[in-house]
Amino acid sequence: MQFEVKDLINKIKKDGLEEAEKLANEIILNAKRDAEAIVLKAESDAKDLKMQAEAEANEYKRYSLEASRQAVRDLIIGTEKNIKSLFKTALKDSVSRVYDDNFLRDLIIKVVDIWSKNDKIDIMLNESDFSNLLSVLRAKIGNRLDDAIEIKPFKGISKGFTIQQRDGNLYYDFTSETVADILFEYLNPRFKEVIKLI
């Protein structure tokens, strides 16, 4: 009987060991499967994250390039506006320098000779030019002054003059600002071509 108990104990040990080994193998197999699933999921997630990061990077790059292009366009437009403004200011200064007393006197006399044959006209000058030119114009225009031609000071004119029919709708602006604006509009297409070359 002693052998039987011993055999029985050995059999229980053996069966327990086999069961434990079987259970351990099953646990290991499940752990390996779970680990493989985790690795596959991690690889899939990593791949998705990488694709998402690449897409975001490409989108950011596209937006950055578009923003850079827009900034360059804005810079070109701003530079062109600044150059135009400088050109226009220089043009106005040049025209104003040409409008000295001699030039104004000669221009007013020519305009009056051509235009005032049958019309009554008003000529408006700035106050400074009015004071400087009135006596010279009286001498040159003579008896037509005050009757057919009236010369008046006007604060709104910096350099040059305006001329208009007294009772009519005709009005001409020979101010330095207007002449400079007309010249600028005439020169503007040529100016744009020069800027494009730069």
UniProtKB/Swiss-Prot annotation:
Transmembrane segments: none
GO molecular function: ATP binding; proton-transporting ATP synthase activity, rotational mechanism; proton-transporting ATPase activity, rotational mechanism
Keyword terms of this UniProt record: ATP synthesis, Hydrogen ion transport, Ion transport, Transport
Domain of life per record: Bacteria
Gene Ontology CC annotations of this record: proton-transporting two-sector ATPase complex, catalytic domain
Biological process annotations from GO: proton motive force-driven plasma membrane ATP synthesis
The keyword RNA-binding is annotated on this UniProt entry: no
Family: Belongs to the V-ATPase E subunit family.
Function noted in UniProt: Produces ATP from ADP in the presence of a proton gradient across the membrane.
Alphabetical list of NCBIfam families matching this protein: PRK01558.1
Name recorded for this polypeptide: V-type proton ATPase subunit E
Organism listed in the record: Borrelia turicatae (strain 91E135)
Gene behind this protein: atpE
